[in-house]
């Protein structure tokens, strides 16, 4: 019989170190969300995120992950508690926070270049056209879409559309990039390619990232910490798992490390335990 006691102990040691030791930049302080019909989506959510940190959130559907990110985006507000960036309470959407959804949200009648340019023009109206064009070209090159600049969304693949969405979000230089299952609809190979590209881009920009995912392998490859949500209603942060692998990360090397599977199995066990508990109740 396989002895997992030692592995679980090691993994729990990582969880105990799951609190960021750097200066808080994005702060969720005693956050509750109750809807007008009385449904309590979130309660007592507390999380400090350092500037430039990459955070992944996992949990079952309906556990309030998107609700939490909507409050960071400014699309929604806490019923109690505060969400703040750099000491400033978030009260509305702003260009310092950009969202990339699973759906691409591109204008199909506009070219790839124009889809990015419209965002740049809206945020930097005082820059010259030459400067704005340069920003668009730089970010399209960053995601490997220089040759597709004059194509329209119906003419490109799903993976390319998501690259456009990421380029558009980063082109306005946000402080926080919010990713709501951005690769969930893509095939496995395209997903891995975009994960690699996202890490390279993040390493260059070093903006703060909050990412929702249902893919534990994706979370372990990309993130600094894994925030695991309990089931709703009244969902909260169950545990925070620190991901110890050094950067830059190599997927093959990570998957050869026994600690990778310790962490992966711990996260899976957390999700299974939550699911079983709800169904037994």
Segments from the language model and where they lie:
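A short, proline-enriched helix->beta-strand linker immediately N-terminal to the Walker B motif
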Residues: 171-175
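Conserved ABC ATPase signature
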Residues: 152-156, 160
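Conserved ABC transporter NBD signature motif
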Residues: 81-93
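Short helical segment in ABC ATPase nucleotide-binding domains corresponding to the A-loop/adjacent helical element
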Residues: 113-121, 133, 137
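Helix-to-loop junction immediately C-terminal to a conserved catalytic motif
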Residues: 73
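Conserved ABC ATPase "signature" region
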Residues: 128-148, 200
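The feature captures the beta-strand-to-loop junction immediately N-terminal to the Walker
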Residues: 58-60
């Amino acid at each position: 019989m396989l002895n997992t006691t030692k592995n679980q102990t090691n993994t729990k040691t990582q969880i105990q170190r799951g609190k960021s030791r750097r200066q808080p930049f994005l702060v969720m302080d005693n956050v509750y969300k109750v809807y007008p019909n009385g449904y309590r989506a979130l309660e007592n959510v507390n999380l400090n995120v350092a500037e430039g940190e990459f955070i992944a959130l996992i949990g079952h559907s309906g556990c309030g992950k998107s609700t939490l990110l909507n409050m960071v985006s400014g699309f929604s507000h806490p019923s109690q508690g505060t969400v703040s960036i750099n000491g400033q309470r978030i009260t509305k959407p702003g260009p310092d926070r950009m969202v990339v959804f699973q759906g691409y949200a591109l204008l199909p009648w506009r070219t790839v270049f124009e889809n990015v340019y419209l965002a740049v023009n809206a945020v930097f109206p005082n820059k010259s056209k030459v400067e704005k064009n340069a920003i668009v070209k730089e970010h399209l090159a960053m995601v490997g879409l220089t040759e597709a600049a004059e194509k329209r969304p119906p003419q490109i693949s799903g993976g390319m559309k998501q690259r456009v969405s990421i380029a558009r979000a980063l082109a306005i230089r946000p402080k926080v990039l919010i990713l709501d299952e951005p690769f969930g609809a893509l095939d496995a190979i395209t997903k891995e390619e975009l994960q690699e590209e996202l890490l390279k881009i993040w390493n260059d920009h070093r903006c703060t990232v909050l990412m929702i995912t249902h893919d534990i392998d994706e979370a372990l490859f990309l993130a600094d910490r894994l925030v695991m949500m309990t089931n709703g209603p009244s969902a909260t942060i169950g545990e925070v798992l620190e991901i110890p692998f050094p950067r830059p990360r190599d997927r093959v090397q990570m998957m050869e490390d026994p600690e990778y599977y310790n962490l992966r199995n711990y996260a899976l066990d957390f999700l299974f335990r939550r699911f079983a508990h709800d169904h037994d109740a």
